[in-house]
Amino acid sequence: MGSKTLPAPVPIHPSLQLTNYSFLQAFNGLPVPAEHVPNLYGFSALHAVHLHQWTLGYPTLHLPRSSFSKVPGVSSLVDSRFQIPTFPLFPHMIHPKQESPNLSNKTKPRFDFANLAVAATQEDHCKLGLMNDQGSPPAMGGLLDVTKLTPEKKPTRGRLPSKTKKEFVCKFCGRHFTKSYNLLIHERTHTDERPYTCDICHKAFRRQDHLRDHRYIHSKEKPFKCQECGKGFCQSRTLAVHKTLHTQVKELKPSKIKC
């Protein structure tokens, strides 16, 4: 017969005899009467808990001093004359379904900052791969993708974002205007529409202000007068053209004197 390897024996503290191991089994989560514990073979309750922790190989769990006295069956084992130091307890009695915090920290993966760009591209490919059976993306994913595709206008530093101006485009030549009235007057040059007609001579005009200036001719009234020569005009634009003549004469006079 071949030799079989036997399981390793349970390690026992040298100061504890084999007869005391039944004490540890009785102490494993069960309340033990106080009269059975004190000075059992010269072994205190505090030593028993330490040895129970070391024998069964549980990970260390540090608790405050007050938590030890709250464990069922342990408060009667503690001598009130001594203060309880902070030492590890058996975790299976306090948190049976919860792992030690030290183990959870070890298993938690760390973020790799060196491969940050590669991880970002992989996440984008994974998001693109998430599609429904019908070939359409999810509802929330579609909304997020639309917001990414729309260009964002960042406001300039120190200034509020300006409102986008409306543009009115001529359907004949494609010229842009910021006001609808200017577009209307411009389109009349293409259509030759003249809705404003003079009552006296029946001359038609595209704009109402042009008709108003025309009426001054019939009334012989010239409200627009030049301040330099005193000549009167019926229309303001005619006076503006007349003023340019005076400015041109002033520019020519100094040049003649220099020659």
UniProtKB/Swiss-Prot annotation:
GO MF term list: DNA-binding transcription factor activity, RNA polymerase II-specific; RNA polymerase II transcription regulatory region sequence-specific DNA binding; zinc ion binding
Name of the gene encoding the protein in the UniProt record: osr1
SUPFAM superfamilies linked to this entry: beta-beta-alpha zinc fingers
GO biological process terms, semicolon-separated: cellular response to retinoic acid; negative regulation of DNA-templated transcription; negative regulation of transcription by RNA polymerase II; pattern specification process; pronephros development; urogenital system development
Domain of life according to the entry: Eukaryota
Protein name (record): Protein odd-skipped-related 1
A Pfam family it matches: zf-C2H2
GO (cellular component) term, any one: nucleus
Zinc finger extent (C2H2-type): 168-190, 196-218, 224-246
Subcellular location: Nucleus
Keyword terms: Developmental protein, Metal-binding, Nucleus, Repeat, Repressor, Transcription, Transcription regulation, Zinc, Zinc-finger
Keyword Metal-binding found: yes
Entry comment describing in which tissues the protein is expressed: At early gastrula stage, expressed in the involuting mesoderm and endoderm. During neurulation, expressed in the pronephric primordium, following expression of osr2. During tailbud (stage 35), expressed in the rectal diverticulum and in the kidney ducts.
